Regions:
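Short beta-strand-centered interaction patches in the first periplasmic/extracellular domains
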Residues: 85-99, 132-211
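Oligomerization/assembly interface segments of phage tail-like spikes and tubes
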Residues: 36-53, 87-96, 222, 277-286, ...
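Short beta-strand and beta-hairpin "edge-sheet" elements
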Residues: 25, 66-93, 167, 299-329
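Amphipathic, non-transmembrane alpha-helical segments in extracytoplasmic/periplasmic proteins
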Residues: 44-45, 81, 92, 105-129, ...
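Short coil/turn segments at secondary-structure boundaries
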Residues: 55, 104-108, 245
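Short, surface-exposed ligand-recognition loops at beta-strand->loop->(often short) alpha-helix junctions
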Residues: 50-56, 110-111, 287-290
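Acidic, small/polar-enriched beta strand-loop surface segments
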Residues: 2-15, 165-322, 334-347
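Assembly/oligomerization scaffold segments
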Residues: 1-102, 190-191, 197-205
Length: 347
């Protein structure tokens, strides 16, 4: 879509359900921040305010007003104003914001994860748009937890058992749960009507980043609780990684009624996923594309700047203007194991 036209993002204001109008020319610094570990997208901008200018009446933006960002009839953002400052600064969030605010009591008694997700949405009053098959059994009680925290934990349990990563997002007022894609998106930018679109990864801004062992874990212990007692079900470790980087251990608990084979597979998946160095890169001032959201994969080919291969977008900030620009935080999709694959699993 982005390759078909020159971006023209317009901001519309709604009050009490009624359209006030296009206020694009009255605002500056229109940006959207989208992060993988945040359920909602944040939109921020500043409104021109001059109490002495009769030709620039106060828009009187207030918490609860709705805003939409439209690009050539396509909705890019729809949300509610949460903060309106006296200085004209405004912050709005999409509907995912509500999932981080309301706390509920929820119990899953050995049900399939997809059923737990459906029941969770019904209890929280959030329509479920769609959910992939999640056969992992969930056995847990949450008291006074946000829906987003419960959902994240359920999907983490599923990932540990299946080895697949999952992502959830609020869109069109509904919650959607899907498998995390590994296919790169075709991200194009068209700077002018008389110029052809080009892949945004062809022209990079400033590139920075780091390689880190901060998130590395090379030994897992799986436990099972029974009343006041807990017992060890199994362990998984990489001796070579422990010898090189030191022991970093994490204790996990069974999420349901896993058998021995499932427990073994879960330990193997946990170790394979977490016994890795984290390679992150940050790119500032890259050409903008609406298809670039948190969680998507981009393909880079700039070995000179240490940015080559497939990278997942962990965070993106869109700066809507002339031109449309972005800043990206990326993580390597398939970072190598920390020190070989000589894993030892005991169940």
């Amino acid at each position: 879509m982005a390759r078909e036209y020159v971006d023209d993002h317009r901001l519309f204001l709604y009050h009490g359900g009624s359209l006030v109008g296009d206020i694009t020319d009255r605002v500056s610094g229109l940006t959207a921040r989208d992060e993988r570990n945040a359920l909602s997208v944040e939109l921020s901008f500043s409104v021109l305010k001059n109490r002495t200018d009769a030709l620039a009446p106060d828009l009187k933006l207030a918490p609860g007003d709705k805003v939409r960002v439209i690009n050539h009839a396509l909705e890019v953002f729809s949300g509610v104003i949460v903060t309106a400052g006296l200085d004209g600064s405004v912050t709005a969030y999409d509907q995912g914001w509500y999932l981080n605010k309301s706390q509920i009591i929820f119990q899953a008694s050995g049900v399939a994860a997809e059923d737990a997700v459906a029941r969770l949405c019904a209890k929280a009053g959030i329509p479920l748009g769609g959910c992939v098959s999640l056969p992992t059994r969930i056995q847990k009680i949450w008291t006074g937890s946000e829906l987003s925290a419960i959902l994240s934990e359920i999907l983490e349990i599923c990932t540990a058992e299946t080895g697949e990563e999952y992502v959830y997002r609020v869109a069109s007022g509904k919650l959607w749960v899907n498998r995390q894609t590994r296919e790169p998106v075709a991200a194009y930018h068209r700077p002018a009507d008389n110029l052809s679109p080009f892949p945004i990864t062809w022209a990079l801004g400033e590139v920075s980043g780091s390689d880190s062992m901060e998130e590395l874990c090379n030994r897992f212990v799986l436990t099972e609780s029974n009343g006041d007692e807990a017992k060890v079900i199994g362990t998984a470790e990489n001796p070579d990684s422990i010898a090189r980087y030191g022991l970093v251990q994490r204790v996990e608990s069974l999420g349901g009624d896993e058998n021995t084979a499932q427990a073994r597979q879960r330990l193997k998946n946990l170790l394979a996923k977490n016994d890795r160095l984290t390679r992150t890169r940050e790119v500032s001032q890259i050409w903008g594309c609406d298809e670039v959201r948190s969680g998507v994969v981009l393909s880079f080919g700039s070995g000179t700047y240490g940015l080559s291969g497939l990278y997942r977008v962990d965070a993106v900030t869109h700066s809507y203007g002339k031109p449309h620009l972005m800043s990206l935080t990326l993580s390597e999709l398939d970072s190598p194991r920390a020190a070989g694959t000589g894993d030892v699993v005991n169940v």
